[in-house]
Amino acid sequence: MDLQLTGRRALVTGGTRGIGRAIVEVLCEEGAAVAFCARDAAEIAETEQALAGRAGTATGSVVDVADGPGLAQWVTSSGDRLSGIDVVVSNVSALAIPDSEESWRASFEVDLMGAVRMVGAAMPYLERSDAASIIAVSSVSGREIDFAAGPYGAMKAALVHYVQGLAHQLAGKGIRANTVSPGNTFFTGGVWDQIQQGDPALYATALGLNPTGRMGTPQEMATAVAFLASPRSSFTSGTNLVVDGALTRGVQL
């Protein structure tokens, strides 16, 4: 199925690792012009080189999402360079799990306010798009209490609430807003790779909770994001798409 993303203009935060990198890859494969950001210049250059020659384009910038003015400037400059913005993907997380004031502040500034500021800066461009889509990457930790309860889970839950509010506020303007909540996702160098090495008992417990017997991949999460980004999902808004291999037990009403 053609997702009709060819020529669409997308912004992705945290686009050099894990789920964010996979999102940039999938959007490029579908023909989108992607602007992505991260904090490491070397990783940005490697990502750009790896994606050269795809159907779409990928251009990276060094941005710290916790820097509000810097984030807004990147969104504006990217929108001007691309002559518009159709898709916004707020993917970055501080991954601040310890229950400390520092973690709470980091989660608030990066996970929640990073999304709020990104959407605010992109709004003038989204309002001019004929297929605007806002996507925030949340987590199953925002839906159920698990080992990441505390700042990480609380801010991921807040993201779902914020984005569903956007969906209702912006529906009349033709702008869709959704969240994707990944389950445990394994990739080299990621959180679960680190847990597997440092706390194999916790890793085994987490793996055993999933009926599929495995963790998800960044590509599986990115595919869900790409569908919500595409005009093919034109009537999907205000939804929290859980992609977890039946990990969570709660019924989402």
Residue ranges: model-predicted function:
Residues 172, 182-209, 250-253:
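A glycine/serine/threonine-rich, flexible loop-to-helix segment
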